[in-house]
Every structure is written in structure tokens, then in C-alpha cells.
Amino acid sequence: MTRGKPGRAHKQAATGEHGLVIAAHGRHYLVERDGGGFLQCFPRGKRSECAVGDRVVYEATAVDQGVVVRVDERRNLLYRSDQFKSKVLAANLDQVIIMLGTEPSFSEDLLGRALVAAESLGITPLILLNKIDLTARLETARSRLALYRDLGYTIVELTVHGAPEAAHAALEPHVAGRASILIGQSGMGKSSLLNLLIPGVDAQTREISEKLDSGKHTTTFTRLYHLPADWGQGGMLIDSPGFQEFGLHHLSEGMLERAFPEFRPRLTECRFYNCRHLQEPGCGILGAMAEGKIDPRRHQLYAQLLHESEQQKPW
């Protein structure tokens, strides 16, 4: 990935065939050829610059291998980062689906960070609350999510195992015709959801793993699945490995303040043009929080992300 300017396409002229990156594992990429079939590809040069969802130009170097010579311009690039490194998730997305469950208890910090990541790129977020048949913790989960519902985020409640047909009917309108990435902690039901929406997903995953030479590491790579053709609208669903943290060290102060939708209308109310919304007098954000119009949890997340963005980054 090009550090500092993620999403920048290669500028050199290139000839070759066109395809779509449908899986990534390290510096190995599986490209779906526009003309049919698949090819394992490697990036040209030392730096890996491809992401699942990228449209690329490649040149075949063998019957089943090739080299990516150009990445087409991206609409967006979703990735996470910490103080030491960054991790590409996917490119050219319409939607970020955040999978939560009533049990085990979900991380509200990860949820908030995923929403900020989506907002910073102008990507629509969708929150799924799975396992609503486990009623012991359902009301607690709903209470924790009330803040996000009040902010205008769409929350779909379902139980993939207990009522698969109802879950399918609830999800299809949200995913059909869109490029979505599915993210979340382990144990929230992502695998069950994939099996519900993508017929034969296990066989597809094994095939992708074999073509990538990733062997037994079938849960450690990001992969793209086309939604069923009989839906009639196209669309794709990208599955990313489960993770427990979602660092956003790459987001600048200006990007962060605009990634909180409840902050945006109040940014012009600050007394100082360079207000950081931490302790400055006459701050529109702090004033709104004092009036109960901004939840302190959201401001706490903003302050933490701002602190992280100030850390020195070697990448």
C-alpha cells in the first residue's frame, strides 16, 4: 500500500488484461479475470499496493500466475492502523457492515471506531445485531445501541441460526447491488451469516485458499464473494478476518471531527478556528455535550482517537 496516500493508483502506463482482486493473503492476490477464470498475482515492486475489491491490470507470467502492473483509481480504501503498521481491509466499498451479537458481549469501542472509519470515507455503515433469540442479554444490547440508533444509524436485528429465512429477508435489501465488507469480532456470527447469504461459501473459501497457497490459514485472509445471481441485482460481500482492535492512527484531526455526524453542525460554533474540542473556551462541541446534545461516550472516543493520531508513525 502506498503510505500517506492510500488509494492512489499507479501512474505508469500499463498494458495487459483486466480483473478484480477477490482475495489477499500477504503479498499473494487472487485476481478474477474479466474473461473468466482466476490467476494468482503478485504486485510489481517491493511494496504491496493491492486490496480486495481493487480493479487491476495484470500481465500473465505463467499459466496460473501473473503480476499486477496497475491498480485502477479507487473510490475509497478502508484500512486500520496502529502506531507501528497499517492493515488494508478492502477498496471500492459502498457499505461497511458491522456484525454484533447479544452474546458474547460486543465491544462498543470497536463499533465506534468502525463507524468513524466508514464516516471518514463517506461509506454507509450498517449495524447488525445477531442472536436476538438469546433474550437474557437482548435488552442490554439494545440499550447500548440506542445511542447509535438516535444518531441515525440503521440497525438490523436478526438471528441467523434461529430464524434464517427472516434474517435473509431482512438483509437482502441492504446488501443486494452493493459492495459491502463484513467486519466484527470473532464469535458474533459472521461465518453463519456468510453461509446464509452465499451458497457453497465453504467450498469457495477452500478453493480460494488453495489458489492462494495459503494452506490451512483459511480464516486469515480477506476474500470477496459475489452475491447470488438469482437475486438479479449483483453485488458483492467481502469477508475480513475477525479482529479485536480497530486502530485509526492515520486519521487527521480534521478528518476525525467530521467523522462524528453529531459534531458536524456544531463545528462552526467554536470561538476559535483551530479549536480541538478538548478543553478550549467557547467550544461548540463541549457546549453541546454540556447541554446533553452530545453523548460523553462519543466525545471520549473522539479524544482517544485524536490522541492516537498524534503518535509518531513510521509507516
UniProtKB/Swiss-Prot annotation:
Alphabetical list of PROSITE patterns matching this protein: ENGC_GTPASE, G_CP
Cofactor annotation: Zn(2+)
Pfam families tied to this protein: RsgA_GTPase
An annotated GO BP: ribosomal small subunit biogenesis
Single Gene Ontology MF annotation: GTP binding
GO annotations of cellular component type: cytoplasm
Top-level taxon of the source organism: Bacteria
Subunit structure as annotated in this protein's UniProt entry: Monomer. Associates with 30S ribosomal subunit, binds 16S rRNA.
UniProt name for this protein: Small ribosomal subunit biogenesis GTPase RsgA
